[in-house]
Amino acid sequence: MVERVVRNDEVRGSIPLGSTNCAFAGKTFRASEHLWRFLLGLRIGSRMQIPGHIDPVSVPRAASVRQDGRVELVGVPRAGIQAELEAAGLEPKQAKLRAKQIWHWIYNRGVGDFALMTDIAKAQHGWMTDRFAISRPEIVEAQVSTDGTRKWLLRTDDANDYEMVFIPDADRGTLCVSSQVGCTLNCRFCHTGTMRLVRNLTPAEIVGQVMLARDSLGEWPSGDEGRMLTNIVMMGMGEPLYNFENVRDALKIVMDGDGLALSKRRITLSTSGVVPMMERAGKEIGVNLAVSLHAVTKEVRDEIVPINRKYGIEQLLQACADYPGANNARRITFEYVMLKDKNDSDADARELVRLIRHYDLPAKVNLIPFNPWPGSAYECSEPERIRSFSNIVFAGGISAPIRTPRGRDIDAACGQLKTTSERKTRAELDALAEEKQATLS
């Protein structure tokens, strides 16, 4: 007997091993393999540890079962969908066929209603709807910049907010995807770094961002040519390598040729330098790598990217040199935010060239003008200073384009993402208090 009181929203109860049913939200459901894995995980402890340069931060374990008792199928691999169907009572042969059909409808057609799945028997539509869900993150707010950049404020089932951004260009469209609610890294120039880490996003919440963007852009089915969403960058809120398993599982679904079908060559994962996870990311995910470098000396990088105190520049660059699949055709991108009188001198530019050459890295450098946000301690380098820096790096044989800021007017530019729902709520409360006071007067 596994005796464990589960304290996660509506879940309560104790479950005997080998039972085919479990109590959830006051109802009895068949216990699928996915549910068992979640509940048995609670036997060990209901909180997981995220590694970091500061004391580890506890976050709730992600569950695949919704508060209504249905199993969420978004973010579950095809074999997992088949297992869920079998656990719900379908014969293995039929479960395999239905899993293939459901996968196609979810990721190729963008359908979230079983009743619209025309190649599945109508008699099974209600049965599936009662047991399974195909959902999207809730959209709290959508904004469009004057330059066409779009930003969405999204909300999880447990009322945590995060953001994603779509950046259109003439020849491509890039979706900036978040991996966590908040962040542990505390990078001094980044607005997200001023938030506390709330929790990791689940595979469903990561894949759901891509699906929402496709919804907004009208880009179903997935295989159509000429689509606007062509690239994905894991550069939104959070450190992807501190949520490695969920990011990996989500990107495998995004890259699946029978589903969302984005090539791994069009996906970039950005890290601030979680050195122990970089090789594993190359082997298990295999997408392009971007590194938030931002400084070339220990003193400056320790200040603005505190993870450098744990994994220094030399360790980081060696991990880049060892990254599987990096070559001149798939260069590593170094992100370098330009901060006035902090990291923007000619000497800094020359040291950057020296470091890249020393480690023989197939690399390019993206120079990012600092995007201001309220309370920041830094200023953006002057345009002529940025051009001088770029010219020195170019002269060293390394591509160093200057990124054009996008979405600044809606706080969607690099380093500006931070959910504003808490601030808005306080403003609303203040407004209500003023109205009440006026009424009393």
Give residue ranges: language-model regions:
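Auxiliary Fe-S-binding modules of radical SAM enzymes
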Residues: R37-Y162, G218, D224, A321-A329, ...
